[in-house]
Amino acid sequence: MLWPIVTNQHYKDALKQAEDGGSPNNISPIIRYGLSGGASVMWMGDLETDFMEKIEDAITPEASDILFAPHHGRKSGRVPKDWLDKIDPTIIVVGEAPSSDLTYYDGWDTITQNSAGDIVFECSSGKTHVFVSNSTYSVDFLTKDDGVGDRHGCYYIGTFYT
């Protein structure tokens, strides 16, 4: 767990704001976990860009293979460039929100949940197979691994290697 740092004044202010009926977005945790020898994943909850910029020096995000974009991938939750460079994700998952509200992270490989539907990451040592529920969704940045078929109620779209 990278965030919250409960002694951080910005966190305390966001907690007070939520307690007073304001938005709870900026009390979201930043959680990172990884499979030994396999993929690492980072979730950033519903953090908003302006808040992330305030706490940018309080934490150092680690490199992660999969980043679930904060605030469902909305422009208002775009990850600061310095953090994004440190995380250096293989894939950024842009969540479900109106497409006009989303940031698509130009220059990074993304899977857009609005189009892909449900997403399954099957993580194993050295590789991660990716499946989605939309049978017509595809990306050009994953490698097809022979012998991997559809499963988990989803369609196989490719593999990345860690």
Where are these regions (language model features)?
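Cap/insert and terminal regions of metallo-dependent hydrolase folds
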Residues: 49-127
